[in-house]
């Protein structure tokens, strides 16, 4: 299935010059969303995943159905102040500054094989920070899956040494 035909390109959003990839027009078609999810599930089964981890917010909508299909848990990675219990955190760079990502301190057991999911690989900063959180808790990043990769931003370079699946490339 050609998933790209279900992604809407929104010009000049959120700012001029950006060609935003809107995945809601993929997700609102059950058969297409299921197909995309199934592709990631097939990849994850080969990796013998124990847990799926995804950064907010679109990492949740990719990762939760994958975790459900695999029969494993899902651990959210959130911005600082959004998780209610004890967390570990990591600073990461944004285009114009820094932000902080957190995960519950007990979300991952040492040695667990983790699949990280997100909707989009752009610069790689969010996933690089997510990897740091997973590994700090003793998890093993067995794979990383995205719906879309923006190849011209070269985010894959920050993830060198990790196995990556992308379903679409722009």
Swiss-Prot record:
Gene3D superfamilies: 3.40.50.2020. It comes from the Bacteria. Keywords: Cytoplasm, Glycosyltransferase, Purine salvage, Transferase. One of its GO terms (biological process) is AMP salvage. It is found in: Cytoplasm. GO terms for molecular function: adenine binding; adenine phosphoribosyltransferase activity; AMP binding. Pathway: Purine metabolism; AMP biosynthesis via salvage pathway; AMP from adenine: step 1/1. One of its GO terms (cellular component) is cytoplasm. It catalyses: AMP + diphosphate = 5-phospho-alpha-D-ribose 1-diphosphate + adenine. Its main location: cytoplasm. The keyword 4Fe-4S does not apply. Catalyzes a salvage reaction resulting in the formation of AMP, that is energically less costly than de novo synthesis. This is Adenine phosphoribosyltransferase. It comes from Bacillus licheniformis (strain ATCC 14580 / DSM 13 / JCM 2505 / CCUG 7422 / NBRC 12200 / NCIMB 9375 / NCTC 10341 / NRRL NRS-1264 / Gibson 46). The gene is apt.
